[in-house]
Amino acid sequence: MKSNLPLFYYQPNDVPYLEKSLELNKRIFKDLLVIKGTDCPEFNNVYKHMCYNSDAFERLCFIRFFKILKYIKENNIDKFLYCDSDAIFLKALDFEKILQDEKCVACRPKEQNKFEDVTGAHFSIWTKDGLEDFCNYIIDVYTNNIDILLPKWEWHVETKTGGGICDMTLMYHWYKGKKNLYEAIGGTFDRGIGMPQNNIADEFEMKGDIKRLRNIDNQIFGTNYNDELVEFFGLHFQGDKKNYMYNL
């Protein structure tokens, strides 16, 4: 049975893999919406770029939240899911039950390196109030509380380590939820098929440049560090791994 909650994407430019993602996610969701648009003065006027990735790219990663918020407020949508354009849901779960009383349930690695500071929205379940709270938090940090971001950025500069401050950093500081999609009941959501880490470091067995995945009765499993099969409820074809999406 398909989910009654809508699934949102944010994709301001044309990319070939979006259509494949939409095609596959239509198996799980009745309603899929692609939000576009890049104008967001309330954010752009306060943003301070502290990242080795491009300014334009990092701005869009933040702007997506404001654009989706505008749409759901105008259309009276109280609960929804979001995924990146290179992410695929594999199973229709009871997303409302997972959300319960939380403002948001996202992907927060239990084990993180020094100044990694990430919580990902690439698979996430939201309430309207939760998204509005997060957008307000972003504005407040860049306006009044930017000091909480500086230690991480200074570490990147001093160590000449790539990355920096991004939307996942702000979400890391904002996110107070007790739930974690990497710790879903009965399985997990994927951080990225090109990395062994998920909730913890070196969590999954690799085959070449991607996680070793098995299709058992039309369900996708990975093998964890305890040699146990773990079902994936969603796969993230991040970076140069997007071509693997076409194998589903």
Predicted regions and their residues:
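N-terminal anchoring/stem segment of glycosyltransferases
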Residues: 1-52, 73-74, 127-129, 133
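A short, glycine-/small-residue-rich helix N-cap motif at loop->alpha-helix starts
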Residues: 17, 56-63
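Short amphipathic alpha-helical segments and helix-helix/interface helices
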Residues: 19-25, 68-69, 168-172
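A structural signal for short, well-ordered beta-strand segments and their strand-loop junctions
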Residues: 33-36, 80-84, 106-107, 181-186
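An acidic/histidine-cluster motif and surrounding catalytic segment
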Residues: 44-58, 141, 148-151
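GT-A fold catalytic core of metal-dependent nucleotide-sugar glycosyltransferases
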Residues: 60-107
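Short beta-strand-to-loop element that shapes/binds the nucleotide-sugar donor at the catalytic cleft/hinge
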Residues: 104-130
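Catalytic core and acceptor-binding pocket of nucleotide-sugar-dependent glycosyltransferases
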Residues: 133-248
